[in-house]
Amino acid sequence: GKSGSWEATDYSENMIIEAEKRNQGEHKCEQLRFCVQDATNLTYEDEKFDVVVIANALHIMPQPEKALKEIHRVLKKDGILFAPTFVYKKGYSKFLIWLMEKAGFKTYHKWQSEELKEYVGSEGFQVVGAALIKGKPLSEYVLVGKKE
């Protein structure tokens, strides 16, 4: 098959350092590069990537539309977005959310699955696949979008 390269990014320099430590030894991936990036202001040129994964991040961003705009910019024509994101059930426990935020898990967006699907669809992506992975306390909605 065709081999390519991978770019792993995070907003936190400490997370990048930890990821680099884990990419060592006999299972080291030579095609993997690590870089600190702000998803709302990426330093990559336009239409650089075939695929972008933004995992468990959209709901913790004050302005996720900025990240989606940047992802749209750096994706090639017909590029694919994978966006696994924590979602909430209708009537979720306000107490549970309060408790999670006190523990440091701050969320700005408490989307339900269909709300997230509509949101991403309104930001320049055609939703071509989605799956709900049930979990406790939160479920995860794995959304696949194609750049329009």
Q: What does each of the following model-derived ranges do?
A:
Residues 1-41:
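Class I SAM-dependent methyltransferase SAM/SAH-binding core
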Residues 51-63:
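A short SAM/SAH-binding and catalytic strip from SAM-dependent methyltransferases
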Residues 14, 62-66:
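Short N-terminal helix/helix-N-cap motif within the alpha/beta-hydrolase-1
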Residues 5, 79-80:
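Short glycine-centered segments of the SAM/dcSAM-binding site in methyltransferase folds
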Residues 37-52:
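A short acidic, Gly/Pro-enriched loop at the edge of an enzyme's catalytic core
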Residues 143-148:
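C-terminal lobe and adjacent flexible extensions of AdoMet/dcAdoMet transferase-like proteins
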Residues 65-77:
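A short glycine-rich, Lys/Arg-flanked "PGG" loop and its adjoining helix->strand segment in the class I
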Residues 82-141:
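C-terminal alpha-helical "lid/dimerization" subdomain adjacent to the S-adenosyl-L-methionine
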